[in-house]
């Protein structure tokens, strides 16, 4: 059986695809309303945020598309739905900012990561603007050039 990768500083799951597909404008920390079996699964690190996004409806924020795999030892009297819609807990003024920005053209609200803060599960969500293909290529070129510079600096110090 393969070892599970340890995430840094209590991080449960990350959505790296969102960082690739969007320009992140502003970040928010939201609590997540979870069932007991979901918390146990998160402690085991069985969560994915790959295609997850935040739906703003009726003055509330909901996390859609996140997948929490139930443990095999979970109770049998509760039917576990791994992709159920989960409520995000935010302050009213934060919800107001999100609603105002998402109604503007081009803005979306995406989930970036899930992590532990003391004994609570938090979800980092972001107000984001979609990238075009040429923006993605430009970001990739910048990352490659930064990597080359770092490599040159390291080899320069060794001499």
Swiss-Prot record:
| GO cellular component assignments | cytosol
Task: Tell me the keywords, alphabetical order.
Answer: Cytoplasm, RNA-binding
InterPro entries in alphabetical order: SmpB (IPR023620), SsrA-bd_prot (IPR000037), SsrA-bd_prot_CS (IPR020081)
SUPFAM superfamilies noted in UniProt? Small protein B (SmpB)
List GO molecular-function terms, semicolon-separated. RNA binding
Pfam family for this entry, one: SmpB
Q: Which GO terms describe its biological process?
A: trans-translation
Where in the cell? Answer: Cytoplasm
Q: Where is this region: Disordered?
A: 132-159
What this protein is reported to do is described as: Required for rescue of stalled ribosomes mediated by trans-translation. Binds to transfer-messenger RNA (tmRNA), required for stable association of tmRNA with ribosomes. tmRNA and SmpB together mimic tRNA shape, replacing the anticodon stem-loop with SmpB. tmRNA is encoded by the ssrA gene; the 2 termini fold to resemble tRNA(Ala) and it encodes a 'tag peptide', a short internal open reading frame. During trans-translation Ala-aminoacylated tmRNA acts like a tRNA, entering the A-site of stalled ribosomes, displacing the stalled mRNA.
Q: Can you tell me which family this protein belongs to?
A: Belongs to the SmpB family.
NCBIfam families linked: PRK05422.1, smpB
User: This protein is called what?
Assistant: SsrA-binding protein
Give the lineage: Bacteria, Pseudomonadati, Pseudomonadota, Gammaproteobacteria, Pseudomonadales
């Amino acid at each position: 059986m393969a070892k599970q990768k340890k995430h840094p500083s209590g991080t449960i799951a990350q959505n790296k695809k969102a960082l690739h597909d969007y320009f992140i404008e502003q970040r928010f920390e939201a609590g997540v309303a979870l069932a007991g079996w979901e918390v146990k699964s998160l402690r085991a690190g069985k969560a994915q945020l790959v295609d997850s996004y935040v739906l703003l409806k009726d003055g509330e924020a909901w996390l859609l598309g996140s997948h929490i795999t139930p443990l095999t030892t979970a109770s049998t009297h509760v039917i576990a739905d791994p992709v159920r819609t989960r409520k995000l807990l935010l302050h009213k003024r934060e919800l107001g900012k999100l609603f105002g920005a998402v109604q503007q053209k081009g803005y979306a609200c995406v989930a970036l990561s899930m992590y532990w803060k003391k004994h609570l599960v938090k979800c980092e969500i972001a107000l984001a603007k979609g990238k075009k293909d040429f923006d993605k290529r430009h970001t990739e070129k910048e990352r490659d050039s930064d990597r080359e510079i770092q490599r040159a600096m390291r080899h320069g110090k060794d001499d």
